[in-house]
Each structure stands twice: as structure tokens, then as C-alpha cells.
């Protein structure tokens, strides 16, 4: 089921936000939340600002939502930062997007370390500029022992490409006698994906009002709950995330059963 903006906060204006957070934490919190962070460019356009201004503002929201997800005891937060299709955007915008990880981690990494957050990346890293790769590698190295929230960036990521790559590696292992055809299963294919060490997302959020998946974690979201909002990513708040989780808690997940 797909809902927009579950009205959890209506009639609760006199209740403190912190109390609401504690109430939500009494319920089941999705272990893995994935977010398609959409609408940065349109947010900027509405304000007669360049698109890169929207991306910069969106980066501030990443910091805020990461901290809040950690507070809620979410185990994995995957953020769709840059797709394999995003290279088609204007060069100036792409160049800025490739600078963002360096800028983001340059200012936020100490806080991530303090918050016990572990940074990971999925996607084709070999095509990223050297400075972008180095920034991500530094963050992963300095947080690899952290045991709190896993902040997983999907950077130059495309799900179809991921699945093709997984099948190619599986076929290579089969040719080398490491895999038998009769052994191939969902679990085996999952083990070849970039997310092999992570649970599948239980909740997928997309901002900006678009109702599509955009080649994001197609295998992993087979049983995810979807939550869409018209809010552009730079305007996304802790309250919106709490709304999404509360909506998730009110749904019945049957996994094909009755």
C-alpha cells in the first residue's frame, strides 16, 4: 500500500515532540530505511536559485535525518545520493554533486564518529572522481569499527547494473566450479549483491511527489513498505520521518499470506 503524509500529528499539538518520539520507539522501528532523496532541483527553482543550491540544502537535511534515525535506533539508513543515470545531468551540476561527499564528510565526519555511525557505500566506485572516492574511503576507514547506525550511501548506483554484475560474478564462479546450477537460490543471488551484509529495506521513502522507484534496490525492496510525500527533500524534517515510521507501524505486512 502507498500512502502520502499520514496525519499522525493532528490533534497532538500540545504533546511535546520528544514524547511523540518515545511513543513511536515503543513500537517496531524498521531495521532498514531507504530514502530516494528527490526534489532538490525543484526546491531551488521555486526560490529562483540555482539547482546546486538545492543540493547544498539537501546535504544539511542528510545530517539532520541521520542523527534522528540514529536516535530512533534505526540500524541501516540507505540514501540514494547519485544514480548511474545522473551522469546525464549538466556537467556543472554533476561536478558539484561529486564535491558534495567531500564537503559533507569534511564537516560531518567527526559527528558521525561521535554518534557511533558507520559509513558504507554501494555503487560503481571506479567511475567516481578520485577526490570523491578518497573522501568516501576515508569515512569508511575511520568508522569501520563503529557499531551504531549504518549510513549507507548509494553513489553511482543502479539496481539493474547491480543485478547484472551479481549474475556475472555467479556465472564466473560456476565456470570455476564454485557454484552448481542446482544450488542457485534467492539467498545465493542476494549474497552477490552490494547489500549482501545488510537486511533488506523494510521501509522505502521517496520525497517530491514522484511515484516511481527509479532503478533503486529493485531486488531488495520486494517486500518493502512504500511511503511517498509531496515534500521536497530540502524541506523533509524529523517529523516527516516520524510520520513515515508511524504509518509503517500501522500497516499489516503479510508477505503474500492472509
From Swiss-Prot:
Record GO terms (molecular function): ditrans,polycis-undecaprenyl-diphosphate synthase [(2E,6E)-farnesyl-diphosphate specific] activity; magnesium ion binding; manganese ion binding
SUPFAM superfamilies given in the database record: Undecaprenyl diphosphate synthase
Class of enzymatic activity (EC top level): transferase
Active site positions: 38, 86 (proton acceptor)
Spans traversing the lipid bilayer: none
Enzyme Commission numbers on file: 2.5.1.-
GO cellular component, one term: cytosol
Alphabetical UniProt keywords: Magnesium, Metal-binding, Transferase
Cofactor comment: Binds 2 magnesium ions per subunit.
Residues noted as binding substrate in the record, renumbered to the chain: 39-43, 51, 55, 83-85, 87, 89, 206, 212-214
Residue stretches in coiled coil: none
Binding site for Mg(2+): 38, 225
GO biological process per UniProt: polyprenol biosynthetic process
Cofactor annotation: Mg(2+)
Family: Belongs to the UPP synthase family.
PANTHER family: DEHYDRODOLICHYL DIPHOSPHATE SYNTHASE 2, DEHYDRODOLICHYL DIPHOSPHATE SYNTHASE FAMILY MEMBER
Protein purpose: Catalyzes the condensation of isopentenyl diphosphate (IPP) with allylic pyrophosphates generating different type of terpenoids.
Assembly behavior: Homodimer.
Name the record gives this protein: Isoprenyl transferase
Amino acid at each position: 500500500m502507498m500512502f502520502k503524509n499520514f496525519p499522525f500529528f493532528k490533534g497532538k499539538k500540545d504533546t511535546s515532540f520528544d514524547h511523540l518520539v518515545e511513543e513511536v520507539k515503543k513500537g517496531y522501528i524498521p531495521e532498514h530505511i531507504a530514502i530516494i532523496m528527490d526534489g532538490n532541483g525543484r526546491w531551488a527553482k521555486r526560490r529562483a536559485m540555482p539547482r546546486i543550491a538545492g543540493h547544498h540544502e539537501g546535504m544539511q537535511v542528510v545530517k539532520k535525518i541521520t542523527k534522528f534515525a540514529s536516535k530512533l535506533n534505526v540500524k541501516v539508513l540507505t540514501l540514494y545520493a547519485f544514480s548511474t543515470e545522473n551522469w546525464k545531468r549538466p556537467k556543472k551540476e554533476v561536478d558539484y554533486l561529486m564535491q558534495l561527499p567531500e564537503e559533507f564528510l569534511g564537516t560531518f565526519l567527526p559527528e558521525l564518529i561521535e554518534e557511533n555511525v558507520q559509513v558504507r557505500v554501494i555503487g560503481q566506485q571506479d567511475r567516481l572522481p578520485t577526490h570523491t572516492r578518497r573522501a568516501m574511503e576515508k569515512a569508511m576507514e575511520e568508522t569501520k569499527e563503529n557499531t551504531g547506525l549504518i549510513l549507507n550511501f548509494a553513489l553511482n548506483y543502479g539496481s539493474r547494473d547491480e543485478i547484472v554484475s551479481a549474475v556475472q560474478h555467479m556465472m564466473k564462479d560456476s565456470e570455476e566450479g564454485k557454484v552448481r546450477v542446482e544450488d542457485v537460490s534467492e539467498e545465493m543471488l542476494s549474497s552477490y549483491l552490494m547489500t549482501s551484509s545488510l537486511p533488506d529495506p523494510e521501509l522505502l521513502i521517496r520525497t517530491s511527489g514522484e511515484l516511481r522507484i527509479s532503478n533503486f534496490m529493485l531486488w531488495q525492496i520486494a517486500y518493502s513498505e512504500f511511503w511517498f510525500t509531496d515534500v521536497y527533500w530540502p524541506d523533509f524534517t524529523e517529523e516527516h520521518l516520524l510520520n513515515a515510521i508511524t504509518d509503517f507501524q500501522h500497516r499489516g505486512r503479510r508477505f503474500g499470506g492472509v
